[in-house]
Each structure stands twice: as C-alpha cells, then as structure tokens.
Regions:
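Compositionally biased terminal segments of proteins
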Residues: 1-155
Length: 155
C-alpha cells in the first residue's frame, strides 16, 4: 500500500485481513486484491463527489451483476462493519446514494449520469479554486458543491 493511501479516510488497518496476495513485483511491491463489496465500502467511506468514487460504486455493482455475482446491501453492510466498525463515519448522502443505486435496474445509464455529475463537480471545484484559492477545504467541499448546484439549478 502506498504511504499516501494509508493517510486517507478510506484506509483501514483491517484491509490486510480481507485482501488476498496477488503478486509481488521486483521483490518490492506487493499487489493485493479485495472483494468487490469491500471496495464499495471503501468508496462509500471516501465518497468524493468530485472524483470517481460514486461512479465506481455504480460500475462495480453493474459489473458484478453482469458476471452473475450481484452484491447485496447485506454484503456491503458486513464489509463496512468489518473495515470501519459500522456506518457512523460514512456520510448519510453516500448511504442514501447506495440504497438508491441498489434499487436501480438500469445501472449502465445511471453510471453515465453519475460520471457526468462527477465531471461537473470537478470542474466546479477547479473553477472555484481558480477564483478563490483558499476557499475549498476537505471539510467544506460538499457544501460548496451543493451551493453551486442550487445556483446552477436556479438559472
């Protein structure tokens, strides 16, 4: 694991218990794999609306469904509890998003929609950062995106 990743909020020291060794490169880099529901749990924890966390969740659910291995809320719940000791640290918006995605039948269309929203959010953040360099912080980014969306919807 990269040292940068271990500093993110989606990192859990329990990941090693739920991952499987895949390969070692040059006797230096260990590559490990993890079940899809654990990856979804990590994406929920990160939950960045301006990166690809939410579209990744839709994409993972879609691919697993296509492969005949649909992922249930119960599977994700188990992964969240095992990695993060519960849902307390996951934003309510992300939990609501997951529940709505699990009810969705057309995940391919939803994937495209969510991906577009993420691209727009990223563009919004970059524009705001350009105009107000010190305004955007990790703890206010969702609020900024929400205000920008409301402003755009009024137009």
């Amino acid at each position: 694991m990269s040292s940068d990743f271990t500093k993110t909020n989606s990192y859990s020291n329990k990941l090693i218990e739920h991952s499987v060794h895949y390969r070692t490169y040059s006797n230096i880099v260990d590559i490990r794999t993890i079940k899809a529901e654990y990856l979804i749990a990590m994406k929920l924890m990160a939950g960045r609306k301006y990166k690809k966390d939410l579209s990744d969740i839709v994409g993972i659910l879609n691919e697993q469904h296509k492969q005949g291995n649909p992922i249930t809320f119960e599977m994700i719940d188990k992964a969240v509890i095992e990695l993060y000791s519960g849902w307390d640290k996951i934003e309510k918006d992300n939990v609501d998003f997951l529940k709505s995605v699990l009810k969705e039948e057309n995940l391919e269309n939803l994937f495209a929609e969510v991906m577009q929203e993420e691209l727009e959010s990223k563009s919004t953040i970059l524009e705001i950062n350009k105009n107000y360099p010190d305004l955007v912080k990790p703890d206010n980014i969702n609020e900024i995106l929400e205000k920008a969306k409301k402003k755009k919807d009024k137009k």
